[in-house]
Amino acid sequence: ADELRKQLMAAGSAEIDGVSGSTITSEAVMKAAKSCYAQAKGEAVVSSVQLPTGDENDWLGTEPDIDEAAITETWDTDIVIVGAGNGGMCAAAYAAQNGLDFRLIEQNSSVMETRHWYGTIDSSEAQKKGIAPVDRAELLSEISRSMGGRCDQRVVKTWINESAAMHDFVSGILENEPYNYVCNLTAGDEAKWPDDTQVSQSKLMFPVQQVDYSSAEKPRNVVFQEYIESKGYSIDFNTGLAKLEKDADGRITGVIAQSTADDHFIRINAAKGVLLACGGYAGNPYMMEQLDPLGTSVTTACSYSPATKGYGIRAAVWAGANL
């Protein structure tokens, strides 16, 4: 440690190698060296706030207290979209199409993996194939029953009532130039699980209507990235959520984000709102064990992104959301 400190001070910067003393070093060592150099000069050191991810007794943890001196950038926009996954990319594409002022931040270096299949109710694709309209009240009841009555029916109704319009938006991009992709619709008996697999009597089994573009050359999220870039927007990669900010009345006014490249903090003021599209918490064992114990005790196979650590959920709860 003393030798590293001497090298840092002698070089006058963090551009050193702890072994050879040369000015070439790995990204990981460089990151640590920058912190050491800042400490050696008596500067405030910016440290990551996204870890740890809670513990075995407290999945939520404590909201980070970020020193104002550590916030070295400020961005102003109308809308902040957090997360370049399936929800965030679709929202960003819609915002770009409508010329909205927004910033899209993503903690990783690329858009997240596309979930190719999504459910729709009475979409234009279903209408083209002559599929009868769905009994929406019955579907809402079935989904609520399968969730043990613990779901928020307002969220389910939003999907039931707006998924067709969402599909029209998606298809308007994917099925036109320069992509011209073909939509695949699975519905009716083809989408129904075999009767002998059912544990309880159920008239409806979802997906009722399933849409996908899995045969497309490019994943949907990559297409959306190209689309928003064609409209003059960009994605702020390597920029993760640190915390939500709110005013004295409790209104969310923006976020504090953190660069995953060098750990500096950025205040992003959002005049009209923040959209959290951060994914779930399947990659956070503490949240899984405490919030979904059955998910960890009886599941024998799973598929999830390691990046889904529930940080957006935790940040929302810290800001006052109910879970």
Language-model region placement:
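Solvent-exposed, acidic/flexible segments
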Residues: A1, S22-S26, M30, A132-R136, ...
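N-terminal Rossmann-like FAD-binding beta1-loop-alpha1 element of flavoenzymes
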Residues: T77-L104
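Glycine-rich loop(s) and the adjacent beta-strand/alpha-helix scaffold that form part
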Residues: A261-H264, N269-L323
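A short, basic/flexible loop-to-alpha-helix module at the beginning of a structural domain
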Residues: D55-D76
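Active-site- and interface-proximal helix/loop "cap" or "latch" segments in soluble metabolic
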Residues: A1-Q50
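Conserved redox-cofactor binding core of oxidoreductases
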Residues: N161-H264, P285-Y286
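Conserved N-terminal glycine-rich FAD pyrophosphate-binding loop of Rossmann-like flavoproteins
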Residues: N108-I131
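Dinucleotide-binding Rossmann-like beta1-alpha1 core, especially the glycine-rich loop
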Residues: A126-G130, L139-I173
